[in-house]
């Protein structure tokens, strides 16, 4: 009978402690505040990329985007189109066939 008396007194105390410990009844209805805080905490932060990490580099460690800009500036911004590249590849293939490579 003594065990039931202790449990009768202990269970409400433990329950009340757990409720206050989780913050569901703390400050009068903090359950919604806590959920919104958790939602904000779980929201991913934006990734801020630095220029050096966002751009790829070649084998020499040079920035490819910067190199391409320099090349285009030297050409006078006359970038080769796909047709010009295809013609150049066909000419190189013919030269290789003629030279016996």
UniProtKB/Swiss-Prot annotation:
Coiled coil: none annotated. Divalent cations stabilize the toxin the in alpha-helix conformation. Residues 1-21 form the signal peptide. One of its GO terms (cellular component) is host cell postsynaptic membrane. One of its GO terms (molecular function) is ion channel regulator activity. Its cofactor is Ca(2+); Mg(2+). PROSITE patterns: CONANTOKIN. This is Conantokin-L. Keywords: Amidation, Calcium, Gamma-carboxyglutamic acid, Ion channel impairing toxin, Ionotropic glutamate receptor inhibitor, Magnesium, Metal-binding, Neurotoxin, Postsynaptic neurotoxin, Secreted, Signal, Toxin. It comes from the Eukaryota. The modification 4-carboxyglutamate is found at residues 83-84, 91, 95. Conantokins inhibit N-methyl-D-aspartate (NMDA) receptors. This toxin is far less potent as an anticonvulsant compound than conantokin-R. It induces sleep-like symptoms in mice. Belongs to the conotoxin B superfamily. Expressed by the venom duct. The keyword ATP-binding does not apply. The mature peptide does not contain cysteine residue. Residues 22-80 form a propeptide. Pfam families: Toxin_36. The modification Asparagine amide is found at residue 99.
């Amino acid at each position: 009978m003594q065990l039931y008396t202790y449990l009768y007194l202990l269970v409400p105390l433990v329950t009340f402690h757990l409720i206050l410990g989780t913050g569901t009844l703390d400050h009068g209805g903090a359950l919604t505040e806590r959920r919104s805080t958790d939602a904000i905490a779980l929201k991913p932060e934006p990734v801020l990329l630095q220029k050096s990490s966002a751009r790829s580099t070649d084998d020499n460690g040079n920035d490819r985007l910067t190199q391409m800009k320099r090349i285009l500036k030297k050409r006078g911004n006359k970038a080769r189109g796909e047709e010009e590249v295809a013609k150049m590849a066909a000419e190189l293939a013919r030269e290789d066939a003629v030279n016996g490579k």
